[in-house]
Amino acid sequence: MILPWLILIPFIGGLLCWMGERFGATLPRWIALITMSLLLALGLWLWANGDYSFAPAPGADPTWVREFKHIWIERFGISVHLALDGLSLLMIMLTGLLGVLSVLCSWKEIQRHVGFFHLNLMWILGGVVGVFLALDLFMFFFFWEMMLVPMYFLIALWGHSSSDGKKTRIYAATKFFIFTQASGLIMLVAILGLVLVNFNDTGVITFNYADLLKTKMSLTTEYILMLGFFIAFAVKLPVVPFHSWLPDAHAQAPTAGSVDLAGILLKTAAYGLLRFALPLFPNASAEFAPIAMTLGLIGIFYGAFLAFAQTDIKRLIAFSSVSHMGFVLIGIYSGSQLALQGAVMQMLADGLSAAALFILSGQLYERTHTRDMREMGGLWSKIAYLPALSLFFAAASLGLPGTGNFVGEFLILLGTFPAAPWITIIATSGLVFGSVYSLIMIHRAYFGPAKSDAVLHGMDGREMIMGVGLAALLIYIGVYPQPFLDTSAATMHGVQQWLGTAFTQLASAR
């Protein structure tokens, strides 16, 4: 019964924030902080008290660590079916942690309509948890689309205009909404197609994951349906050429919105590929793998090259996310358990390091009132601790050994090499560009001649706790990743079996 509460807690907390605004602006902040802390605590409790050797695998009914099922619309085979395994648990703990951080980082930034702001923030996170738990495909689609509306309000009502003043927050919010909504509708068509194919085969209408895994279909049908899912996830991940909404949404969103976008919303797409696209359509995925890995490779370089050219610090971090997600895409489609484990580690580590960079850029904006790096410079000696933390997270972002990002990238490259040596070699050279744009960002913002003589105040306790806490966690994951690898091992083994079997069949057919 604990699984529905993981989803309900953020929704109830959001309503309480909205209603609590009449008692002052501070109450909604505390309600939101307690709500997210409770979600994180429940995630940690589940981690401590679960056996994560249970996970779905081919050839048998999926087994789960925890499961909740309640018939909802019997006529169409729709049920409230939630289930937890190692992969979804890691993602829920990441959601809880970044939820706490997004409340903390907006503590002073948001002054207008504080209650409604936190309602939207909590409902985004509730929708994300729903995506990570839902197994019924109708429920999954419901939560997938539900996240978009509060995110739209978050960017449109509390966002900033771009540093050159040309692009407004409404433009960014609308672009985000249209891209993700349109891709979601393509996925809805694919879900309905899959349900109808299964109905023609069995005579039963069902949206249940376990039943749809057994659907028999021709390779052409499988390929078309797989593309429907892939496009929806590719837009959210984002994969080049579906990425153009991301820099605008990041640059114009408030800090909390950027933290949630980079840290959690992009990860729902990678989760969707691992949970739905590969297991439901293994043969089509195996055939599509070279194309997907090539798209990942293009993303690594394209994101890095565009990051070079940015003057807006938040747009630079946004393009670095495009580059990092390219590695995740390569890892997912490699068919190797090492690389799949690496993709999960990269999702966790990139969620933390990108969130940290956005939090620090928000703190920088509060002090300098600009996001344009040409107007910064010479700040290293002016703000205590903030430049040093920025340097650490920039180094983590480029994959410094000893941080979680290194573990993820190393495992992806190590696991992919036997299957696709050329892609691995080219992707490895992409790491060099990662170091260049990370160091360019630090150099432009903190070194060089000072642009103003204004006295800037140092970091307060709240800001220090966020920065140092995230740094400590990234180092912990980098030095001792085993607990996280053990948690996701069974799930990734199942995904690898689906894809590995399909690769073997494909090779023998050729």
Regions inferred by a protein language model and the residue ranges of each:
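Transmembrane helix-loop-helix hairpins at membrane boundaries of multipass inner-membrane proteins
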Residues: M1-I2, L16-L119, T206, A210-D211
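Structural signature of hydrophobic alpha-helical transmembrane segments
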Residues: M1-I9, L84-T95, F138-P150, E222-F233, ...
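Central hydrophobic cores of alpha-helical transmembrane segments in multi-pass inner-membrane proteins
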Residues: P4-M19, I34-L46, I92-W107, I124-L125, ...
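Alpha-helical transmembrane segments of multipass membrane proteins
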Residues: G14-M19, L44, V103-L104, G126-G130, ...
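Alpha-helical multi-pass transmembrane bundles of energy-transducing inner-membrane proteins
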Residues: F23-A25, L119, W123, G127-M217, ...
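Alpha-helical transmembrane segments and their helix-start/interface "positive-inside/aromatic belt" motifs
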Residues: A25-S37, Y171-S183, A384-L386, G461-G469
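Juxtamembrane/interfacial segments at transmembrane-helix boundaries in multi-pass membrane proteins
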Residues: G50-S79, D164-I178, G184-H243, L273, ...
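Predominantly late transmembrane helices and immediately cytosolic-facing juxtamembrane segments
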Residues: V240, A354-L357, I423-H457
